[in-house]
Each structure stands twice: as structure tokens, then as C-alpha cells.
Regions:
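Active-site core of metal-dependent hydrolases
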Residues: 205-327
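His/Asp/Glu-enriched, well-ordered alpha-helical/loop segment
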Residues: 303-384
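C-terminal cap of metal-dependent C-N hydrolases
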Residues: 40, 374-428
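Divalent metal-dependent hydrolysis catalytic cores, especially in the metallo-beta-lactamase
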Residues: 119-147, 155-172, 192-209, 231-235, ...
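Metal-associated gating/positioning segment near the N- to mid-region
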Residues: 75, 80-152
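Histidine-rich, glycine-flanked metal-binding segment
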Residues: 30-35, 42-88
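Divalent metal-coordination and catalytic microenvironments
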Residues: 40, 55, 60, 82, ...
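Bacterial N-terminal signal peptides
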Residues: 8-23
């Protein structure tokens, strides 16, 4: 066959194959997406997306965000019409329950001690959270144990602020300055750069008289030194006293990018006697100081939050400070709902629960629905009615709006779906669903198997 004949033969073969392929039934072609969320209102502040659109997920990654993706292109389709589809929420103030040291506040064996205790990492999934940041539960001497016992096994992504105290959040040792070794702290952070995103200091010498072993700024200064050595931000849980003032902390001690958590706690003078917002907050923000909610069981007062929000001061990030002392009444969506009831728009709250905290911990790959990024997704619903919200002073605020999580997707897998959005109605379930297993045999397949 001549060269021209070979070319003609190849072209005819290609045309025949293309024509044949175009006539193959759709089911013979492999679906482009493993999962398709269809008809939801997508809010992705990182990409300035705020519209009704479909989200396609493939191989655990965001594969498409478009106004209309055919259902035939997906192996599984979930109708999320009337719901919000957002990046997975990020809770940057969380406390993990793990073995820890014998005196660790958050250790299971320490339940007899006064004080809060850590909670399971995956509890966060029920609030649309796909990333939690442990806020100093572990220090340099206990982080490896936390990693092996919790981080390595959690479905939710777990990152951490390393406590400047080597033993971690441990009541007595938190008051021991010799436990605060900036070099050891920085060395540990460098050893786990993919997991440890910053430093945490908390609870140091809040009441007792100062002495040579307990200088006022010891914990703050040593945490800052570790932050400088490791080039990471510091999160501050702080109690002001005459010798270490709030103004000095946020206007002099804290660096740009450092995080002041518990901003609406009772001890901070964020309001002047006349009720106006303390101008040092705006000054600190201009310096680059970050303000975080860190709600917790003792760090959120409506008497501070409501007037501040009305005057335009909204924390940069939402967070829970979740532990056994508050988990029965608190979650990430509950924190968001309180601010929603104060008049903060949902779109703004999603920004402060996704892209903002991602920037604070220097993880721009998180808190986004960008194509190619890991498919961490929250499906939320805004409810309207009569709701009561409580603060840590046992006071109530009434509201008429609330946000709840309806589905959580972590790395492309549905890990929370309490209403069965992704499930078949039981009457339409396949045959194996109705099969009773024989004694001693394997369990029957589920409706989606």
C-alpha cells in the first residue's frame, strides 16, 4: 500500500471509530464524576463564587463548578436544591481527646480533675467542619503521642498549634516557665511542618502574685520566640493584669499574623465605659493582628459581642474551642448561627469559616472549591423560626435564623449525611437490602452496595 493509501486508511478508520463511539449508549461511557452535587447555592469566597451551580467531584478532588452539569456525567448524584454548598469549614480552635500525660487536662484518665477535657476529632464533621486545628492540647513532649493516637486515624483533617509548654495543656505544668522552651518548640514544629501550623500559649499565672519564677510576660515572650524561630503564627489565650495589659499585648507584643482568640471573653476591655468600641482594636488590626472567636465554655459574652458587632467589629475567624465542657451545646454551625442572629450575613460568615482561617494558618489549599483541590465540602441549610442562643454567662439571646449542616464531604467521600440526602428511599432499595442474613454469615450489603 502506498503512503497516501496508508494515510487514507488511517483517516477512514479514525472517522469510523469516532462515529461508532458517538452512537454508543451513554451508560457505556465511564462517568466523568464520582459525585455530583446538583442545584445548590455555591458560596466559595476564595473564588468569589456566590450563585446556584453544580459541583462535580472526581478522585477525591474538585473537578468542576458549573451552572449545569448533566446528571448522566456522574456515578452518584445528590440533589442539594435549596441548600448552600461551601468549602468544608475550618475550626482553628479545637481540643482533641487523647492519651496525653497523666495530668493532661484533655486526657481521658484525667476526668476527675476540674477543667475541660478534649473531644473526638471526628465530632466536628457533624457541623460541616473538614479541618480542625488542635489549639495547644499537646506540646513538644506530647505531640507525637497526639499524632499517633488521634491525627493519624481521624477522618477529619487535623492540624495543630503546639503549646509552648512542652507537656501541653497540663494544669500544673502550664505554670512552670522551665517547661516553656522556645528552641524545643521550634524544633518540633520543623519536624512536623505539614501538621503543626503555629504556637499556642494559654492559662499562665492568671491570679497569683508575680515572683522571680513567674514574670508577667514569660509565656507570651517565649511563645513569640518560638514563633519567630519556626516562622509560624502564635495563638494567644490571655488574661490581662495590671502588670501585663491588654493594650500592650495587641499593640506591642503580637506580630502581624498572630491570633488573639477568645476575643469576646469577659476579661477584655473591647468596649469603653460609654459602650463604644475600644479604638485599640482597630489599631491592632491595622498592625495585622488577627481576632478569633474561640467561643468555649467561658470565653463568649453577648454583652461584648453584640455591641461590638453592631459597631462593625466582627472577628476574622469563627471557632469553637470545643471540649467536653461545652460540646453538648456548641458546634461550629452554632457559633456561626449566633453571629447570623446578630445580623452578620451568611456569606460573610462562610468567608470567616473557610478562606480566612485558611490564610491564618497559611494553608491556602484549604477553605476553597478551586478545581484540583481536595474535595472538602459542607452542605448547609439556613433555617428560619424562633431560636434561643446562650453565652458563657448563662444569658440568652433570641434569634430568628439558624444554620445547620446537612452533609459533610471529606476528600471526596460523604462522611456525614444524617438526613440521607445521598441515600435511596428504603422502598426503592435493591434486593440485598431486604435480605436477612443467615446466622454466622457476613452482614447483608447495604442499600448502596
Amino acid at each position: 500500500m502506498s503512503s497516501w493509501g496508508k494515510v487514507r486508511f488511517f483517516m477512514l478508520s479514525l472517522a469510523f471509530t469516532t462515529a461508532l463511539g458517538s452512537k454508543l449508549p451513554a451508560q457505556a461511557q465511564a462517568p466523568r464524576y464520582d459525585l455530583l452535587l446538583k442545584g445548590g447555592h455555591v458560596i466559595d469566597p476564595a473564588n468569589d463564587v456566590d450563585k446556584v451551580a453544580d459541583v462535580g467531584i472526581s478522585a477525591g478532588k474538585i473537578a468542576a463548578v458549573a451552572e449545569s452539569i448533566p446528571a448522566s456525567a456522574a456515578e452518584k448524584v445528590v440533589d442539594v436544591s435549596g441548600l448552600y454548598v461551601t468549602p468544608g469549614l475550618i475550626d482553628i480552635h479545637y481540643h482533641l481527646g487523647h492519651g496525653g500525660s497523666p495530668l493532661n487536662w484533655f486526657a481521658p484518665e484525667a476526668r476527675s480533675q476540674a477543667g475541660p477535657l478534649g473531644v473526638p476529632a471526628d465530632l466536628a464533621l457533624a457541623a460541616g467542619v473538614t479541618t480542625v486545628v488542635d489549639a495547644g492540647t499537646a506540646g513538644a513532649d506530647t505531640f507525637l503521642q497526639e499524632k499517633e493516637e488521634v491525627i493519624d486515624h481521624a477522618r477529619v483533617r487535623v492540624l495543630a498549634f503546639l503549646n509552648i509548654v512542652a507537656d501541653g495543656m497540663n494544669g500544673g505544668l502550664e505554670q512552670t516557665v522551665d517547661q516553656m522552651d522556645p528552641q524545643l518548640c521550634a524544633q518540633t514544629i520543623r519536624k512536623f511542618p505539614d501538621l503543626i501550623v503555629g504556637v499556642k500559649t494559654a492559662h499562665f499565672w492568671t491570679e497569683k502574685p508575680w515572683d522571680a519564677l513567674h514574670p508577667p510576660w514569660a509565656a507570651v515572650d517565649r511563645a513569640e520566640e518560638c514563633g519567630r524561630l519556626a516562622n509560624v503564627p502564635v495563638m494567644f489565650d490571655f488574661w490581662p493584669r495590671p502588670e501585663r495589659t491588654y493594650a500592650e499585648l495587641i499593640l506591642k507584643k503580637m506580630r502581624p499574623g498572630d491570633i488573639h482568640t477568645h476575643v469576646f471573653a469577659q476579661q477584655f476591655p473591647i468596649l469603653l465605659p460609654d459602650g463604644k468600641l475600644n479604638p485599640i482594636l482597630a489599631e491592632a488590626r491595622r498592625r495585622g493582628v488577627v481576632f478569633d472567636v474561640g467561643h468555649g465554655a467561658g470565653s463568649f459574652w453577648f454583652r461584648n459581642a453584640v455591641p461590638a458587632v453592631k459597631q462593625g467589629f466582627i472577628p476574622d475567624s469563627m471557632s469553637t474551642d470545643l471540649h467536653l465542657g461545652d460540646f453538648t451545646v456548641l458546634s461550629m454551625t452554632e457559633v456561626m448561627s449566633k453571629f447570623l442572629a446578630m445580623g452578620v450575613p451568611l456569606e460573610d460568615l462562610i468567608r470567616r469559616s473557610t478562606v480566612n482561617p485558611a490564610k491564618e494558618i497559611r494553608r491556602p489549599d484549604l477553605g476553597t472549591l478551586s478545581i484540583g483541590q481536595e474535595a472538602d465540602v459542607a452542605v448547609l441549610e439556613e433555617l428560619h423560626g424562633h431560636f434561643g442562643y446562650i453565652d458563657d454567662g448563662n444569658a440568652r439571646m433570641n434569634g430568628n435564623v439558624k444554620v445547620v449542616a446537612r452533609m459533610t464531604i471529606r476528600g471526596g467521600r460523604i462522611v456525614y449525611d444524617p438526613s440521607g440526602l445521598s441515600m435511596v428511599e428504603w422502598e426503592k432499595a435493591p434486593k440485598q437490602y431486604f435480605t436477612t442474613p443467615q446466622l454466622g454469615s457476613s452482614p447483608p450489603a447495604k442499600a448502596d452496595k
